[in-house]
Amino acid sequence: MKKNKLFMALMAGTIVISGCAAKTDKKEESKTAQVNTSKGTKEQLKQATDLYKKFVENQVDTLLKDTEKFAETIKAGNLEEAKKQYPVIRMAYERSEPIAESFGELDVNIDFRLADYLEENKTEEGWRGFHRIEKIMWEQNTTKGTEEYADQLVKDIKELKAKVATVEVTPDLMVTGAVDLLNEVATQKITGEEEI
């Protein structure tokens, strides 16, 4: 009987120790999996942010070239051609907006709507960028008066290009910018408020 009790106690101890060892192994496997997943996720995020930054740099390059051409068209007084170029140029800016918006004042100089500018400044004085040019071309049906704004827009986009080249694109910046843009689309662009 004592032998059976001793045998049972040894067996129970062995089972408990084996069970604890198995749990430790599972914990170690779990930690290793978390570390591997974490490393993999970080690498994937780095690849995604690097690709997105490259995409935005390409969009800003296109934006600058197209805006320079647009400024020349405006200075030549070719209203119809300028009106054709305008929405195409805007698309390149919109695609870079999740990062461009992070440059505060520069985004305001390039892409601020009149309604928002008036709300903040109580005057049109100092308002410039795409929407200033747009207002003159469509409301006054002319390119006259847009030349200085077009030149300034080119300068602002050159500054944007320089800043985009040096910005660190983090997952937070990429996601926050995208969410902000989606909110803007939902509250302004879809409803037509973007054009006010």
List each language-model region with its residue ranges.
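Non-globular terminal segments
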Residues: 2-13
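Bacterial lipoprotein signal-peptidase II cleavage site
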Residues: 6-7, 17-32
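Mature extracytoplasmic or organellar-lumen-exposed domains after removal of signal/transit peptides
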Residues: 33-196
